[in-house]
Design a protein with these regions (language model features):
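Generic multipass alpha-helical transmembrane bundles of integral membrane proteins
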Residues: 79-253, 268, 272
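Internal alpha-helical transmembrane segments of multi-pass membrane proteins
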Residues: 71-82, 96-105, 277, 284-299
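C-terminal transmembrane helix-loop-helix hairpin of multi-pass membrane proteins
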Residues: 129-133, 196-204, 243-258, 265-338
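Hydrophobic alpha-helical transmembrane segments in multi-pass integral membrane proteins
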Residues: 56-68, 115-126, 262-280, 337-338
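Cytoplasmic-side transmembrane-helix entry/capping segments in multi-pass membrane proteins
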Residues: 41-52, 100-109, 249-259, 326-330
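Transmembrane helix-loop junctions in multi-pass membrane proteins
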Residues: 5-11, 36-38, 62-68, 209-222, ...
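Core alpha-helical transmembrane segments of integral membrane proteins
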Residues: 1-97, 106-117
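Pore- and pathway-forming membrane helices of multi-pass small-molecule/ion transporters and channels
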Residues: 23-27, 82-86, 103-116, 229-239, ...
């Protein structure tokens, strides 16, 4: 996928490289479906499916040719998200189990499709589109457990087999109004619970992918508010990890938060302002050195804080005071995203 994307200087995939990417994507998608449906080979299906999605995204961006004099834009990204969404849905439907990675791409491509469509309608820039994706991905995390249970069709709620009010003669025969109950299918409920767990992992992974992509755009921009939003997104993803209890879900959220902060740091290091670069080229590096000191101090403070939290909580846990403090801090960080 990377070779075909870089083969054309303008990234116009409405050409021979796009055809190669489409052929590779369709073949990998077909092999993934066969391994999942016929052979029940989860590992091979996931590997082949994840290999197919980037190629299909590259091929999807070339469904329409570029306008003369213009590069790749919102329309091409919209088509790429649509193709990835269709392919990920197909892979999810044909996979009998272990389709969490495909659900993640379904969620991420659906959010990308919605935001790029909004950016196309309202003529939004890349930073504005990323600023829309970041709060959407963070805010959606709170609704994912209930959404996963609905998709898995878990039996939610309880209907009493007895009447709400005893009828005439109930004191004589306590079992007079009791209807015969079917035996509980424990295996089916356990399978639905596992299905809900897999769906939740995929949905969390999709929101994590969107947040990391938005933080990459915001962190490498020259907009100060955008960089602050990338910082808030990373901190919010770290704090939102307390919503989940399973290791995979917590790890995905924590990894996304750390990736957002790392991308912000890399963007700040690689993209100093034009005025600082002009002064440095003229021999005046004082302002650039001061900026470097601030960046190093901030990175060191973040590393010390993460290390301290990991060492303290693994030994003694979180006290009620610090738990309440983290909840208040989480509310404050979420408000900054709005």
């Amino acid at each position: 996928a990377f070779v075909t994307w870089t083969a054309e200087p303008r990234h116009d995939m409405h050409s021979f490289p796009g055809v190669l990417a489409a052929v590779a994507g369709v073949l990998l998608l077909t092999f993934a479906c066969v391994r999942a449906r016929v052979y029940d080979d989860r590992a091979a299906a996931v590997a082949l499916g994840l290999g197919a999605l980037p190629n299909l995204a590259v091929a999807g961006s070339g469904l329409l040719p570029l306008t003369d004099g213009d590069g790749i834009g919102r329309l091409q990204f919209l088509l790429a998200c649509a193709v990835v969404l269709v392919a990920a849905v197909v892979l999810t439907l044909v996979s009998p189990r272990g389709d969490g990675p495909f659900v993640a791409f379904v969620c991420a491509s659906a959010i990308g499709l919605f935001t790029v469509f909004a950016a196309t309608v309202w003529r939004m820039e890349a930073v504005e589109t990323a600023a829309l994706c970041a709060p959407l991905a963070v805010g959606a995390l709170a609704f994912l457990p209930g959404l996963a249970m609905r998709f898995a069709r878990l039996p939610i709620g309880f209907a009493s087999p007895h009447a709400a009010r005893p009828t005439y003669g109930a004191d004589l025969d306590p079992d007079a109004d009791r209807a015969p109950q079917d035996p509980v299918d424990a295996d089916r409920i356990a399978a639905q619970a596992r299905r809900g767990h897999e769906l939740l992992i995929g949905l969390v992974g999709g929101c994590a992918l969107v947040s990391v992509g938005a933080a990459a755009v915001l962190g490498f921009s020259d907009d100060g508010w955008g960089q602050l939003l990338a910082l808030a997104t990373g901190v919010a993803m770290l704090m939102r990890a307390q919503l989940f209890r399973y290791t995979a879900q917590v790890a995905a959220t924590l990894a996304a938060g750390l990736a957002c902060l790392v991308l912000l740091g890399v963007g700040l290091c690689l993209n100093p302002s034009d005025s600082l670069m002009r002064d440095a080229l003229n021999g005046d590096t004082a302002a650039l050195d001061l900026r470097t000191i601030w960046l190093v101090a901030a990175i060191a403070a973040a590393a010390v804080l993460c290390t301290a939290v990991g060492l303290i909580t693994s030994r003694s846990g979180v006290t009620p005071f610090w738990g309440r403090f983290l909840e208040i801090a989480e509310v404050f960080v979420l408000l900054t995203l709005v």
